[in-house]
Amino acid sequence: LAVKNLHRSLVIGCSALALAGCGADDIASPGGTGVVINQPATPAPTPTPGPTPTPTVSAPDICPNLTNDGSVQLTNAGTISGPTGSYRICQLPSLITKSVELPRIAGVLYGMNGRVDVGCDGGFSAPSAGSPYNSTTIGCGTLTADTGVTLSIAPGVILIGQTGQSWLAVNRGNKINAVGTADKPIIFTSQDNVAGFNTESTQGGQWGGVVLLGRGKVTDCNVGTVASNTCERDTEGAVNLARFGGNDDTYNAGRMSYVQIRYSGFVLSNN
């Protein structure tokens, strides 16, 4: 996936050439059938298949600490086994309130059980003491400044959607920094992918996806109007508000490169 500055509201997971053209309910990236960090070169055809690989990954006993003050805590959600070994699921909180990095630790998966918000929604433009904003994000309240949270993800980290309704929302005034490498891509995928239930014919729709909510101009308003330069829009299908739009076409929601997004595109709601 090419390095891009990501503007407005982008849903990552369609195609690397159409990042801005994806809707929140139509993203899909089938990917592989099992979680493999280092993708091997295509082998020459052989008359007989090789033996099934021996699982090499073992789950650690505990989840890592992300912050010294305990402000962002992971929940130990048990283990899961698949063709590549056993993993411990370290579940992200529903609201990430402080900048953190998810480190790569052998046998650790970072889980999303439902919607995970990166920071609080800061509104159409950055709030201030003179112009506070009542954030639409659950658990945030009134803001007098952007929360400025950055979720950083180390190369080789695997994140999973534990349910169909699981998705990552990077709210206005916050960022994601997910920069993998060619040999250690960052993988967002479904729990079934890790468990080895998926096949070559498995389609997307097993979890929601990754949504970047920005302050670029939009024209399909359901809040405000284009004429008054107050146009905003709600993310389709979100149970609770996930709003995007503003008046800053230079807005930067972070950086993503060498990222795989597999089996995403679950329909969050029928409307």
Which residue ranges define each predicted feature?
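Bacterial N-terminal signal peptides that target proteins for export
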Residues: 1-10
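C-terminal motif of bacterial Sec signal peptides marking the signal peptidase cleavage site
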Residues: 18-21
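Beta-strand/loop edge motif enriched in small/polar residues
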Residues: 23-271
